[in-house]
Swiss-Prot record:
Keywords for this protein: DNA replication, Early protein, Host-virus interaction, Viral DNA replication
Record gene name: 14
InterPro entries: P-like
Family indicated by similarity: Belongs to the phage P protein family.
Keyword ATP-binding: no
Identification of the protein by name: Probable helicase loader
Further details from the record: Its C-terminal half might bind to the gene 15 protein and its N-terminal half might bind in addition to bacterial replication functions.
Subunit structure: Forms a (host) DnaB(6):helicase loader(5) complex in the presence of ssDNA.
Length: 229
């Protein structure tokens, strides 16, 4: 498999070639190659244990390198960069009756559709985050928003803080969401509860006196009863 340095050199050569032909440079909002590679290396051992027959079909080192390359690309392009996401995919993989290794695209779909210990995935967090941000004008405070579950409140409020402080791009926001989700899943796995959303109790409405119209009507009725109207 190509080293990180070689991958970077190839990327630079491609960018220079594009500029030479008056084409725009290409940038991908994705996790660092090193981080994705670390996650995949841990997954590789689990795949060998879950699908030993399929993994034995790799006859040469070249076959194995191509397999790694395709899976690494799929992970990097689809935002799979935490072990929480991979664990979610492996839970579904181990339930499969067929002993065949899933395709990279199929495994990525499993990672995204299955939540971890909280039953929530990154896509759901991002969707609820933007719904909250787009509807924030409807509520007095963030606590009043109808969160699907308390952990969404804690994650989204922290996401807003990080996004404002660091001016995150959409891809960076998704990665931060994955990191926060991973952190909360570890807390739950360790037996720590998710704090509830503490909504402030509304102050009692102040008693209001009669309106000017009511005062005039009362005066009219008094005058009428006294024969003055």
């Amino acid at each position: 498999m190509k080293s990180l340095a070689e991958q970077m050199r190839n990327h630079d050569r491609e960018q220079m070639s594009r500029m030479a032909h008056n084409l725009p440079e290409q940038y991908q909002e994705c996790a660092p190659v090193e981080q994705v590679a670390q996650v995949f290396n841990k997954l590789f051992n689990e795949l060998r244990a879950a699908f030993p027959a399929s993994m034995a079909n790799f006859r040469t080192q070249e076959d194995l390198n191509e397999f790694r390359r395709q899976w690494l690309l799929a992970f990097q392009e689809n935002g799979i960069h935490t072990m929480a996401q991979v664990d979610a995919g492996m839970r579904i993989a181990r339930r499969q009756e067929r002993p065949f290794l899933p395709s990279p695209g199929q495994f990525v779909a499993w990672c995204k559709q299955s939540g971890g210990a909280l039953g929530v995935n990154v896509d759901q967090v991002i969707a609820e985050y933007w719904e909250w941000r787009n509807r924030s004008f409807e509520f007095i405070s963030s606590e009043q928003f109808p969160w699907s579950q308390p952990v969404m409140y804690h994650i989204c409020v922290e996401l807003r803080h990080r996004s404002t402080e660091r001016q995150l791009t959409h891809g960076e926001l998704a990665r931060e969401a994955g990191d926060l989700l991973d952190m909360w899943e570890r807390r739950v796995t360790e037996g720590k509860p998710v704090p509830p959303v503490r909504r402030a109790i509304a102050a009692p409405a102040a008693e209001q006196g009669p309106t000017p119209i009511q005062l005039l009507l009362a005066k009219y009725n008094r005058n009428k009863s006294n024969g003055m109207v």
